[in-house]
Amino acid sequence: MGLMHRVLLLATFALLCMHAKAAGFDHDKVPRTVERGGGARQLRTATMSDDEARVSKLPSFIESFVKNRKIESWIQNKVTDDFVLSELKLVRLPGTSLADDPNFKLFQKFKIGGWLEEKATTTKAWENLGLDSLPFDQVSKIDEFKTYTQYVTVLNKKASKLDIDQWHGLLSGGSPEELMAKAMILRTLGRDVLERRVMLGGHVVVPF
């Protein structure tokens, strides 16, 4: 039996236990509630609502867990972007944006997780997304730039946990267009001019 199968069985068992607990609570409390009057009835109702809320939250937790495991599996097996797009039913239609689909965030998670796994540079991400083939004034208008922005955001957060002399190796490098894009992203993330110069390289002209 595979790991995913065992996880689903355990999650289903937990869900059934929660339902059974809620049902048992109702059965035990009914006589006492009738004897104690309106005040007790309100207390019972509030407690039931808490139990029901916990039960209703469990399926979404299971769903989130399964999705995360699936993404991890895709990353480990190095599946193609086309495979993941197909699995997530993400289809680029004329006049629409993939970013409007809730599953686009899962695709971003797959891409960023893969880059982190291989310790990819931002330049590799930039080129992998095809941003190097576009005029600079068009880059920010496509869905792929949103994914690139997320990767820079993750690395910026990682930089906050490192010594300043390690920043350069994390975010430096790239064409003038990519460096300008990174500088603009880092600015929106609250990095000042000095910090951006340290991250990108002292020779880089960064926008104020």
Curated annotation (Swiss-Prot):
Q: Which domain of life is it from?
A: Eukaryota
Q: Name one GO biological process term.
A: symbiont-mediated perturbation of host vesicle-mediated transport
Q: Does the keyword Signal apply?
A: yes
Extent of the signal sequence: 1-22
GO cellular component terms?
extracellular region; host cell nucleus; host cell peroxisome
Q: Where is the stretch described as W2-motif?
A: 111-136
Q: Where is this region: W1-motif?
A: 70-92
List every stretch annotated Linker region ln2.
Answer: 158-170
Q: What functional role does this protein have? A: Secreted effector that acts as an elicitor of hypersensitive response (HR) specifically on plants carrying defense protein R1, through its interaction with this protein. Also acts as a virulence factor that promotes colonization and suppresses cell death induced by CRN2 as well as callose deposition, a hallmark of basal defense. Interacts with host exocyst component Sec5 and thereby disturbs vesicle trafficking, a cellular process that is important for basal defense.
Recorded protein name is RxLR effector protein Avr1
Q: Which organism is it from?
A: Phytophthora infestans (strain T30-4)
